[in-house]
Each structure stands twice: as C-alpha cells, then as structure tokens.
C-alpha cells in the first residue's frame, strides 16, 4: 500500500467512524456493531453490483464485444427503445452470477435505500409488495433496511440466515439511520479518489479494509467481551506468516469474525498467488463459531472478500458439536477461548478426538489442542 492509499484509508476510517459513532448515545456497542457492519455489507454488495452493471453497459455498446447490442436492431442509438432494451438486459441475473457478483434486487440497491430513506411513512415505494400488484408502503428506515436484507438473502441462497434483519426491532431513530446512510453514500467506493488523484483500489478491497477496521474498533469499545470475536491483526498476521498457507484447506475451530481466513487470502495475494475470478482461489476455508451473531459477522466478512466458505451451515459449540467431523485440514490456526471451565458433558467421554487421552474436565485447553490435532492432515501444520 503506497502512502497516498494509506492516507485515503486513514481519512475514510475517521469519516465513517465519526458517522457511526453518533449511534453510541442510543445503542449498546454490541448492538450498534451489527447495525453499522450490516450497512457496510449492504453497501458492498450494492457497489459490486453497480460496478458490474456499468461494465455491462459499456459492453452492450461496444461493437467489438460479444455482448454488443446493435442500435440498428432497436430503433437506433439514443432512442427510448434502445435505452429500454439496454435497461432490461442489465436486469438479467446471469450476467452477474457468472462473475461471482451477488444479485441485488431493486429494493436492496444503495441508491434506492438512500432515496427511499427520505420518503414519509405511508407513501408508496418504487416496487410492489411481495406477492401483490400494489406498491409497497414506506414504514420506517429500520424496516426499509430489513426489507433490503431479506431481499438480498432471498435472491442469494449462499447468504440465507447470514444478514442482520433486526434494524426495525432495535427501534433506532429513523433520522439517525437516514443520516448514516447519507454519510456512507457520500463515499464513492467504486471509483475512489484522494487529493484529485484516482486510486486503483477496488470496492472489495476498500470495504474489506473498512470492515476489518470497524471490527477492531468495536472490539475495543466492548473491552474484554470484544475479544470473543476479534483477534488483533498483529497476532493473526504473525500466525499466518509462520504457517504460510499458500494452498489447501484452512481450518479455524474458534473462528470469531474470520480474521485468520482473511489474512490467509491476503498472504497468498502478497506472495504472488494466482488470481482466479478476482480472488486468489487457492485455499478453501472451514470454520466453526458458537455465537450466532458472530457467526453472521464471519459469513459477511467472507462474502465481502469474495471467499467461499464452509462454516457448518449454522453456529455450533465446537467441543460439544463438531460440525466438520471428517475434515483433515492442511492448516489449522485458532485463538480459542483459554481456560474454559464449564465445557464438559458426559457424551464427550469416549470422543474420538481425544487421541492423547481424555482432557481435564475443569479446563478446556487440552480439549482445544486435541481437537485441532485431530483435524490436522498427516502433512498439515498448526
């Protein structure tokens, strides 16, 4: 990262954190964390969708491209007929999924959110209510965001039960949420500039950086409790640099928000890893997390980075319910909760993971160690 890009990130972090911090007066840190990170995720998928949309528009109008739409077949260039056909073609889902871009329906697109957040309750919205031929009616901004999250999940099965849909239930003031949306809208993640200079950063890289920064800030705000889902980047980087996970299966049995996976992918990119479909694509990640909200944070983190993942399909206690019983990983890395006292149950007595003997019932440290060894491939590292 060059000095200009570093300054861009520093200014961006300060700007967005200042905007998000306005919610602290009315929400606990553990709650507003999910509000802000959920909006960042929605901004990411919408920006990625818009990037692909702009790319497609140029391809439709390029005579040299396979997707070219000849104006002569649609009433001529610049005619309403031609523009309508371009617009219709831009709504074809396959153009996006072929590039591993999430399909974002109209009601979940960022510009729609920004504009509709200003509409008074009871007024019509620019889409029909689900299953009806009548326009949906505006309620609150929290409901508007929940509706967007539900729409993204509905259209992208990979994200099912991943996104936070509790904006309305937290009863956050609509004006504060609308202001936060406006602040995020004010930043162009797709075409970043700094001091008049256009930067070569992609929206995925920018939002991934912002997501990581916010996770760290929220962990600090929550104190000791924040350490349950966030391992400091310096520690994560050290472990990844030691193990050097260039390719293969990477497993974290206490994954928190997924920091080890993100750093593994960054390690490959920094050391000349081949790029496939916009990502290095040389590792497959497996993880487990017992806290449902933290599990969602990790899944969103992977989606923002474009990483395929297997988190067992649901949250789960790793020691009590191993969701990857047959996994033998090439790299195992973790920062498990140390000195857990209340972890044992009778069903664990003859568990096959205890390859060196049954661990002490009053402390889970040796249970974690044996669990990790059990899931390590014969030639693996941990």
Located regions from the model:
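Non-catalytic, mostly N-terminal accessory regions of nucleic-acid modification and defense proteins
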Residues: 1-246, 310-323
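Conserved Class I SAM-dependent methyltransferase catalytic core
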Residues: 15, 22, 31-44, 239, ...
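Conserved S-adenosyl-L-methionine
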Residues: 225-334, 339-343, 350
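Mobile active-site "lid"/loop adjacent to the S-adenosyl-L-methionine
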Residues: 338-367, 379-381
């Amino acid at each position: 990262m060059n000095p200009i890009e570093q300054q861009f990130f520093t200014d961006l972090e300060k700007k967005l954190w200042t905007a998000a911090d306005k919610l602290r007066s009315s929400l606990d840190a553990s709650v507003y964390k999910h509000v802000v990170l959920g909006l960042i995720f929605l901004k990411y998928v919408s920006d990625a969708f818009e990037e692909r949309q702009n790319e497609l528009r140029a391809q439709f109008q390029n005579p040299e491209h396979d997707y070219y739409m000849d104006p002569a077949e649609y009433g001529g260039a610049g005619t309403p007929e031609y523009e309508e056909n371009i617009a219709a073609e831009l709504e074809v889902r396959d153009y996006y999924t072929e590039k591993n871009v999430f399909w974002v329906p109209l009601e979940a697109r960022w510009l729609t959110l920004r504009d509709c957040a200003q509409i008074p309750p009871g007024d019509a919205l620019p889409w029909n209510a689900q299953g009806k031929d009548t326009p949906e009616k505006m309620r609150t901004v929290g409901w508007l965001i929940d509706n967007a999250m539900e729409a993204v999940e509905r259209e992208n099965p990979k994200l099912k039960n991943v996104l936070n849909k509790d904006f309305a239930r937290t009863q956050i003031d609509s004006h504060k949420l609308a202001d936060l949306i406006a602040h995020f809208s004010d930043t162009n993640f797709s075409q970043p500039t700094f001091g008049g200079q256009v930067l070569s950063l992609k929206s995925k890289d920018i939002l991934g950086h912002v997501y990581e920064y916010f996770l760290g800030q929220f962990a600090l705000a929550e104190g000791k409790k924040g350490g349950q889902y966030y391992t400091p980047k310096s520690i994560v980087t050290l472990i990844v640099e030691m193990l050097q996970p260039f390719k293969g299966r990477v497993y974290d049995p206490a994954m928190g928000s997924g920091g080890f996976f993100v750093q593994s992918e960054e390690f490959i990119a920094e050391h000349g890893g081949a790029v496939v479909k916009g990502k290095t694509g040389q590792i497959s990640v497996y993880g487990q997390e017992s806290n449902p909200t933290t599990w969602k944070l990790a899944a969103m983190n992977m989606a923002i980075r474009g990483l395929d993942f297997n988190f067992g399909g649901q949250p789960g206690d790793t020691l009590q319910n191993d969701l990857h019983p047959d996994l033998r990983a090439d790299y195992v890395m973790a920062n498990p909760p140390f000195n857990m006292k209340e972890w044992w149950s009778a069903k664990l007595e003859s568990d096959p993971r205890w390859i060196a003997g049954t661990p002490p019932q009053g402390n889970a440290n040796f249970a974690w160690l044996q669990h990790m060894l059990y899931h390590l491939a014969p030639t693996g590292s941990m």
